[in-house]
């Protein structure tokens, strides 16, 4: 089981994402220079579109329709996949991503350095939903449509990520944090799934013995 490449790949994604998330928070939220750079990036990007204060904009109206389309598309992919395990993995990824983002935003502190709004907005709950749907699309897309599905999923996710920055809903650090939460959740779920599958195979009876005792 320990030599399972699928398990190690998923575990590596989970670990790298977790470490990246922690480092990102410590830098862009936990330091004055990090807060300043993060806030200035948001201000400069939004200024290109004439946005000076947080505003609903077009994305405020398009957000829910885009999410509904995203959930419908994922449901179709899961139905076509016809795998109960994939459905369970998808549900776990979405729940862990959204729950993780909500808990982190509620618990993490934003030190007061006089830079931008004092309330913590790391990570972005809005982007976390799009990131979770993208992660699910990655694991359930059929090989024949994989390229098209991934282009659509990452494209919509990128548009949502850019929109919340341009409209001053979130700073770039908040957005990247949401993607890392989704990657960490997906990696953790896939790691558990790979470990469970390997353990099931090892315990499968073969000639009166489990596979672990062959020979």
Stretches found by the model and what they are:
Residues 114-215:
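Membrane-embedded catalytic cores of phosphoryl/pyrophosphoryl-handling enzymes
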Residues 14, 18, 90-102, 179, ...:
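Alpha-helical transmembrane spans of integral membrane proteins, capturing the lipid-embedded, hydrophobic core
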Residues 59-82:
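Hydrophobic alpha-helical transmembrane segments
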């Amino acid at each position: 089981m320990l030599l399972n490449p699928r398990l190690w790949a998923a575990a590596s994604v989970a670990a790298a994402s977790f470490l990246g998330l922690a480092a990102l928070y410590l830098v862009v939220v936990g330091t004055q220079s990090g807060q300043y750079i993060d806030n200035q990036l948001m201000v400069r990007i939004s200024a290109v579109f004439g946005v000076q204060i947080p505003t609903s904009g077009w994305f405020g109206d398009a957000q829910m329709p885009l999410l509904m389309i995203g959930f419908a598309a994922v449901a179709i992919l899961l139905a076509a996949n016809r795998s109960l395990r994939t459905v369970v993995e998808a549900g776990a990824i979405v729940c862990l991503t959204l729950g993780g983002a909500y808990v982190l935003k509620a618990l993490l502190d934003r030190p007061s350095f006089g830079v931008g709004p004092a309330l913590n907005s790391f990570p972005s709950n809005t982007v976390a939903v799009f990131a979770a749907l993208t992660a699910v699309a990655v694991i359930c897309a059929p090989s024949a449509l994989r390229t098209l599905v991934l282009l659509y999923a990452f494209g919509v996710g990128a548009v949502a990520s850019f929109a919340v920055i341009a409209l001053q809903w979130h700073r770039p650090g908040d957005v990247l944090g949401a993607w890392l939460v989704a990657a960490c959740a997906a990696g953790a779920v896939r790691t558990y799934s790979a470990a469970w599958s390997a353990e099931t195979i090892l315990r499968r009876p073969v000639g009166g013995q489990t596979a672990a005792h062959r020979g």
